[in-house]
Amino acid sequence: MILQVLLLVLGFLMLVKGADWFVDGASGIAERFGIPQLVVGLTIVAMGTSMPEAAVSINSALKGNAGITIGNIVGSNILNILIILGITAVITTVAVQKSTIWIEIPYMMIITVLLLVLGKSGNQITLSEGVILWVAFLLYLGYLFYCAKKNKEEVVEEEAKPMWKLLLATILGLLLVVWGSDVTVDAAKAIARGLGISERVIGLTVVALGTSLPELFTSVSAARKGKADIAIGNIVGSNIFNILFVVGTAALIVPVEFLPGFGIDTVIALGAGLLLWVCIWRKRALTRPAGIVMLIAYLAYFCVSDVVFL
């Protein structure tokens, strides 16, 4: 068991470092080709911080570990909102753009409902339903590029890294994420079997926390640097990416089982999104008291879930 825990930690470290290298390399390459920084931030960075969830969930789907696939995504989305934004808000007040309140967060909640409906309709996400999620993902990308074009900012010239270094970082980062996901899934499955608990619980808690580390580091770092407004955009973007791209891609490869307990967990994820919206819609900011409320909400969710009955 000790070996499996060490392997799980190693897998998490590989995921975090791999995602970091991928984001740096891919962002640098995109900027070298003149792609606006806003587009890079809204797409590559948000997707890059979600790479651990993507790799672990798709890998677990291929290995037939349904509990880890959906559990990781739903658990990560709950944790991203309540824990990561909660911690960030406790550190500093988080400013929120108007479009985030009225477009992006509502869209996140709509696709959460879509995931629930698709999952409960046949207790699995099928190929055709994966296509639906991908269409919704492409619509979201179209919206992002529209916003980028509308709000294009002047790019500040900086000393560029050699192209070979950017390519090397991108390739090594991607390989490290893929390898780390394999180590993480195998270790998590072994721990679940050893402790006699379900893969769903492992996916919702331990794996969700580990794969959310990039979002946590990005948001807390932004808050400390006085750029807390980046935090909500990163989290909301990552949550949308998790549902539409990750689950959608996994379903295109193999039908993804939607276990009965995931219905409640998905409703909790929807509730977390609604709580976030309620906390920010008046002042267009996420304050410290709101952050504390969100942390308490996650603690309550954790306590009333079947985790306490393990």
Label each residue range with its predicted role.
Residues 1-310:
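Hydrophobic alpha-helical segments, chiefly the membrane-spanning helices
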